[in-house]
Amino acid sequence: MPEFVSPFSGLAHERKLTPEELIRAIRFMIAAEYEAIQLYMQLADSTDNQLAIDVLKDIADEERVHAGEFLRLLRELDPEEETFYAEGAEEVEEEIKKSKKA
């Protein structure tokens, strides 16, 4: 689980990131975006104030865009990442086919 105390949690400050560290940091940022989406949507679901609901949902949508940007960057930095996503998608496709036959 990401630790949000510091944006550089676990990272060295006195040098540039290695490619592997950058990839890990991008994964951390993706997790942070998804956590932010969850928090904004929970708050929106917890109020009757329509203005707050609208603003929170809009911000959550912006976080989804950020997650997409980070995911695209991750795929560029680590092309092998896409093979894992494709494998996972194929596994779900197989389950979908099974459930439609049942």
Question: Language-model segments: what does each one mean?
Answer:
Residues 1-102:
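Iron-associated oxidoreductase/ferritin-like identity signal
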